[in-house]
């Protein structure tokens, strides 16, 4: 059977079982033993499975893998990998190490609970040798499960695990094609929003490029690039946090424009902190980019261009969320998975107008549905003022029709802006209902991107 032929999960598991050079262990917690099960049911499992274990009891798990880490965390996954790999090599390297590529597959999963009130997610890891006797290589995923039931989640995890093991042994090409192979037959059932690789088998792979490739492949809705540490899953920075989001293209990041973006985000964080009125809460602020183009029909920004913008923002101490889609309501959807605290967008008038002018053809409810999803119960838009001359140019660039405004000393704020009829009635409503919150005119004149 040609290696280029696309195999289903059953065929992949059987091919691995019949390959006498690959042999390893499985440790799965939280979603059954669905990965190991594939190898056990297709036939020839003795050619692949040295051990399969699930340590559900916390005391048993602590005895095997140590204490101190959350049970569903990268730290726990790494402890599992260290333990399982160490045992495998200690027990089998002498007897069959000269002709065996060893591997240890582990996962720790928070599956959907009975009430369906949690956010199902988990960590998946694989340590393996690319050739017998070789140094170990490692790949770690953070995943989000999107299936509506626990049995379906388990099924998807099983497919993902088989795909991963098959891909490292038979399809370890470029990062993008590797990810496509790992995601085969999964669709939108599992998101991968974090990847970490190490070892000679992944030489030349760039982790940040891989994260962006996840978005381009439709495998994640967002990835995170903090300024002070290495990449983490969005869950790690959004969980139960009050959040301020500053979306933009950030195409122009010369010192002047960069300072404007920085000031807008900082102003939003200050304003939300003032809303808390003395509560000991520190909002988290993020610059938000999109892997899609700002204007419909334009080509999407490439990986190199996105990394250039990310580097420029990180150089100024900015934490970044990079989203797969451009629409603001998709950002609300993602952030509200992880927090019920206050969420605030900081937007300029030009982006506000784009949001109202955008054609939401993919939504059954069009603009009204987009607006209702954007302005969820915990969401408000802080609207940053803009100079009248810049607003005029922006409206021409957008080709927006019927917008009018007045200004104060050359500056236009949200209450001074008027869309065309009938949008003006809806605009008045969201403004009067405090979903749109005007921000103060800056003390010194500045142009907005």
Q: What is each stretch, according to the model?
A:
Residues 4, 23-26, 35-38, 43, ...:
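Active-site cores that bind ATP or allylic diphosphates and position pyrophosphate for catalysis
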Residues 2-16, 24-25, 31, 37:
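Long, charged/polar, low-complexity intrinsically disordered N-terminal extensions
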Residues 253-268, 293:
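Conserved catalytic-core segment of nucleotide-activated headgroup transferases in glycan assembly
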Residues 19:
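Hard-cation-handling environments
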Residues 31-32, 54-58, 292-294:
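Short active-site-proximal "capping" loops at secondary-structure junctions
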């Amino acid at each position: 059977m040609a290696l280029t032929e696309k195999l289903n999960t059953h065929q992949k598991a059987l091919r691995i079982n019949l390959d006498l050079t690959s042999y390893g262990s499985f440790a799965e917690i939280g979603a059954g033993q669905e990965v190991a099960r594939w190898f056990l049911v297709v036939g020839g499992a003795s050619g692949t499975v040295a051990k399969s274990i699930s340590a559900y009891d916390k005391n048993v798990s602590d005895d095997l893998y140590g204490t101190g880490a959350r049970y569903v965390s990268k730290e726990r996954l790494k402890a599992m990998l260290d333990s399982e790999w160490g045992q495998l090599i200690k027990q089998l390297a002498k007897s069959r190490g000269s002709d065996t590529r060893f591997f240890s597959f582990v996962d720790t999963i928070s599956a959907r609970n009975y009430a369906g009130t949690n956010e199902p997610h988990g960590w998946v890891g694989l340590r393996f040798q690319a050739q017998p006797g070789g140094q170990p290589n490692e790949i770690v995923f953070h995943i989000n499960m999107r299936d509506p039931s626990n049995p379906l989640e388990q099924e998807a995890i099983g497919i993902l695990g088989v795909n991963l093991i098959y891909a490292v042994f038979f399809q370890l090409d470029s990062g993008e094609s590797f990810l496509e192979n790992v995601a085969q037959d999964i669709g939108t059932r599992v998101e991968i929003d974090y990847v970490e690789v190490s070892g000679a088998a992944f030489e030349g792979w760039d982790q940040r490029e891989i994260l962006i490739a996840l978005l381009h492949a439709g495998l994640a809705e967002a990835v995170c690039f903090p300024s002070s540490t290495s990449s983490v899953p969005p869950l790690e920075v959004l969980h139960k946090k009050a959040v301020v989001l500053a979306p933009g293209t950030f195409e122009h990041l010369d010192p002047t424009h960069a300072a404007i973006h920085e000031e807008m985000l900082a102003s939003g964080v200050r304003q939300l902190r003032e809303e808390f009125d003395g509560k000991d809460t520190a909002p988290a602020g993020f610059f938000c980019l999109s892997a899609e183009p700002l204007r419909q029909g334009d080509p999407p920004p490439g990986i190199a261009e996105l990394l250039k913008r990310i580097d420029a923002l990180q150089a100024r101490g900015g934490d970044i969320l990079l989203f797969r889609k451009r629409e603001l309501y998709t950002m609300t959807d993602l952030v509200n998975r992880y927090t019920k605290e206050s969420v605030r967008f900081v937007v300029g008038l030009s982006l506000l107008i784009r949001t109202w002018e955008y054609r939401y053809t993919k939504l059954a409810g069009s603009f009204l549905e987009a607006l209702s999803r954007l302005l969820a119960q915990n969401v408000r838009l802080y609207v940053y003022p803009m100079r009248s001359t810049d607003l005029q140019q922006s409206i021409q660039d957008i080709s927006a029709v019927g917008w009018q405004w007045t200004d104060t000393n050359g500056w236009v704020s949200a209450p001074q802006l008027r869309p065309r009829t009938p949008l003006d009635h809806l605009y008045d409503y969201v403004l009067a209902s405090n979903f749109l919150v005007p921000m103060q005119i800056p003390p010194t004149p500045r142009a907005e991107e």
